């Protein structure tokens, strides 16, 4: 329990963190990785290079300062981050390292303004927050390891099939190398894949959505090939060009909070852009299998037909459903965007909406859904990468 004095001091630093947060977290990561380069085997280097991880951490630290009196308010974000940590293999022993370099970064950036009183308050606050993460993640590790066919950290999987889904997306079907089955996962969850890429100094970790409904014998991930000059492209290009049937890759157990309530039978809309279609595939197939009478809408936006993955699969599942509407738009054609008018025509605002795609796409769709009268509790969305904030207007 934090003292009133500590909470007051931490809250008073919120405006400073809003102004200097990203600078602090940039210094933090730079100094921590210089002292502990082994941690680069865990973190996504591309997110570091693009500044996304720094911004995400700054947002989290700021939110903790604002809500220090009621940390329950940031519990959804904590659970989301903890899922990512468990997927990546973050351990309790890493938290003191993070705390040390975060405090040093605050002092380095703020200088004399970071008084001993402020640093002591933040040290206490970090201890409480880190303890909450450690306890939650320890419990999550136990659950994933103790579930049927579960494991913790990473396990070898064999590529048993490789399928081109579009000009940009390729699916990899993965089975445990030891011949065991895979655990049941929730539609919408992801796995982490850890790659030792020739020429790269550190391991590369990436999260990919499971793109088919849960089945006992295999996982399927569907990977978009990023541009050659994109920092995110290192892993995807390696997978597309060098990982083939028979090869082994390291996989973590399914994780994530962007999941479908498979028992709910209220109207549901899946709205995706580009590779954001991948988690929707496991959700849509699950609805088709378990609740085929559920009123369902699937809206997808792609650049063109050659980049549109899973069209035949969606039509196959839709044919087994009683109340389904499936529509696609291509941005290289006239009227090729998901507009408010389209959403008003096809989305039942009394139900649930699941949104995934590029950030500008999600911002536009979510703003339209809110304007149509949907509550935030009805709208679910997933970022591919560190969580950011959806703009309100």
Language-model features, listed with the residues they occupy:
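Short alpha-helical basic/polar micro-motif
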Residues: 30, 100, 186, 278-281
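FNR/FR-type flavoprotein reductase catalytic core
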Residues: 120, 234-393
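Glycine-rich His-Gly loop
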Residues: 37, 195, 273
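Glycine-rich, flexible loop/turn motifs
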Residues: 13, 35-39, 84-86, 181, ...
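Generic structural "secondary-structure junction" signal
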Residues: 19, 41-45, 83, 90-92, ...
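Ferredoxin-reductase
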Residues: 147-248, 302-304, 331-333
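Globin-like tetrapyrrole-binding proteins
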Residues: 1-154
């Amino acid at each position: 329990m934090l003292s009133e004095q500590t909470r007051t001091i931490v809250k008073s630093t919120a405006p400073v963190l809003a102004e200097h947060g990203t600078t602090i977290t940039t210094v933090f990561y730079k100094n921590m990785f210089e002292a502990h380069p082994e941690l680069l085997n865990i973190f996504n280097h591309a997110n570091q290079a693009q500044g996304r991880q720094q911004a995400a951490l700054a947002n989290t630290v700021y939110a903790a300062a604002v809500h220090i009196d009621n940390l329950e308010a940031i519990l959804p974000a904590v659970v989301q981050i903890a899922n990512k940590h468990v997927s990546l293999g973050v351990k309790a022993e890493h938290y003191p390292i993070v705390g040390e370099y975060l405090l040093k970064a605050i002092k380095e950036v703020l200088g004399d303004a970071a008084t001993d009183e402020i640093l002591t308050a933040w040290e206490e606050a970090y201890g409480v927050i880190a303890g909450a993460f450690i306890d939650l993640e320890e419990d999550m590790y136990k659950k994933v390891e103790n579930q049927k066919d579960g494991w913790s950290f990473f396990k070898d999987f064999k590529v048993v099939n490789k399928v081109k889904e579009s000009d940009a997306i390729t699916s990899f079907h993965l089975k445990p190398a030891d011949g065991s089955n895979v655990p049941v996962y929730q539609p919408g969850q992801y796995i982490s894949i850890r790659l030792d890429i020739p020429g790269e100094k550190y391991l590369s970790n990436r999260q990919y959505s499971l793109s088919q409904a849960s089945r006992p014998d295999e996982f399927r991930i569907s990977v978009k090939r990023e541009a050659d000059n994109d920092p995110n492209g290192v892993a995807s290009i390696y997978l597309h060009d060098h990982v083939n049937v028979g090869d082994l890759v390291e996989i973590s157990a399914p994780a994530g909070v962007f999941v479908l309530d498979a028992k709910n039978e209220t109207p549901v809309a899946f709205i995706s852009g580009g590779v954001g279609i991948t988690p929707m595939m496991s959700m849509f197939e699950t609805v088709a299998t378990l609740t085929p009478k559920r009123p369902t809408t699937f809206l997808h936006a792609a650049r063109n037909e050659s980049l549109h993955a899973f069209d035949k699969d969606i039509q196959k599942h839709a044919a087994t459903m009683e109340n389904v509407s499936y529509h696609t738009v291509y941005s290289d054609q006239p009227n090729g965007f998901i507009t408010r008018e389209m959403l008003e025509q096809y989305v039942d605002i009394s139900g649930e909406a699941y949104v995934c795609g590029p950030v500008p796409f999600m911002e536009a769709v979510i703003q339209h859904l809110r304007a149509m009268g949907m509550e935030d509790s009805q709208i679910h969305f997933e970022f591919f990468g560190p969580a950011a904030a959806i703009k309100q207007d």
